[in-house]
């Protein structure tokens, strides 16, 4: 199934039914009072987090959803039937944004979580409500209220504890295959990973966390180059970033410069994202069999990058060092979760930090998209102008017969 992480839809809640004008008509009661019922309520529109879907592809093809209208009122003071609500199922991790105002309506992060996105209109009043001491037979009823109409953007961000970042072919997909049951495509060419992959990492009984692998970043990614920047928003919810660095790139490039590329692109795209705790994984140590040479190379990379955080040496081919990373991540995540439970101030600070991070990532993603669209428009216009300037008749005198 095609992976779609954004969709724009229009939702229309149902209008309320109309109240009616009606009077009692019974034998021996020729002048019965008013008995017009109220209109029924229009249907609401909800979104529901569903763990059976992982893409917004359905909303690329059906872009409008209308709830039903409430029934009109009936005689004998019977109200019209309310319309059924409609429920739009989205993957866990979907954010609902008002596309016209940019306001975030809600975030669906738990299975079965529901969010009201468009409220149905209330039904109109029947003439029973307008009876008074001076008007015993009112001929007045009101129409139902209109349901809400909204244009919304659905934004999917995968829900993961750890995000993998790095250049293409750094070994991210092989790493997630090694530590989880995820089976992303692995090959010897760049951009093998085209969409985010999720894997559940089991560390022990009732101990696990979720890891996300996104397409590799390249230099210029923050300006729209490559695939990774489009999916960088998917690591905005993570607690840790795992920076996978190939210490012996097959193309002969400098691993230090490769590491700087990722750090620079991350900082340029989102300083808040760059401030997330990062762990450096010096990968493919099996490519340097000499222990002294390997140690010297790893120390050189760490020193040149000025890295002060945790560092691990791994081989995703042989599995060396991978378990150490798993246990370290699990312990860090559990320690942070326990502190959030025990310290309300820390929990609130974490919540505010993630809100700032998501807002910054959303803004920067939209700006990058606009810049990319503007560049494409400029390229098309330039190509069109070049075609107009390409005159095959240059230097040829054309004489028109009378």
Swiss-Prot record:
GO terms for biological process: ribosome biogenesis. An essential GTPase which binds GTP, GDP and possibly (p)ppGpp with moderate affinity, with high nucleotide exchange rates and a fairly low GTP hydrolysis rate. Plays a role in control of the cell cycle, stress response, ribosome biogenesis and in those bacteria that undergo differentiation, in morphogenesis control. Pfam families: GTP1_OBG, MMR_HSR1. Its EC number is 3.6.5.-. HAMAP family: GTPase_Obg (MF_01454). It is an enzyme of class 3 (hydrolase). The gene is obg. InterPro entries: G_OBG (IPR031167), GTP-bd (IPR006073), GTP-bd_Obg/CgtA (IPR014100), GTP1-OBG_CS (IPR006074), GTP1_OBG_dom (IPR006169), GTP1_OBG_dom_sf (IPR036726), OBG_GTPase (IPR045086), P-loop_NTPase (IPR027417). GO terms for molecular function: GTP binding; GTPase activity; magnesium ion binding. GTP binds at residues 166-173, 191-195, 213-216, 283-286, 315-317. Mg(2+) binds at residues 173, 193. Residues 382-402 are annotated as: Disordered. GO terms for cellular component: cytoplasm. Residues 160-334 form the OBG-type G domain. Its cofactor is Mg(2+). It comes from Psychrobacter sp. (strain PRwf-1). Keywords: Cytoplasm, GTP-binding, Hydrolase, Magnesium, Metal-binding, Nucleotide-binding. Belongs to the TRAFAC class OBG-HflX-like GTPase superfamily. OBG GTPase family. PANTHER family: DEVELOPMENTALLY REGULATED GTP-BINDING PROTEIN-RELATED, MITOCHONDRIAL RIBOSOME-ASSOCIATED GTPASE 2. This is GTPase Obg. Residues 387-396 have a biased composition (Acidic residues). Residues 1-159 form the Obg domain. It is found in: Cytoplasm. It comes from the Bacteria. Monomer.
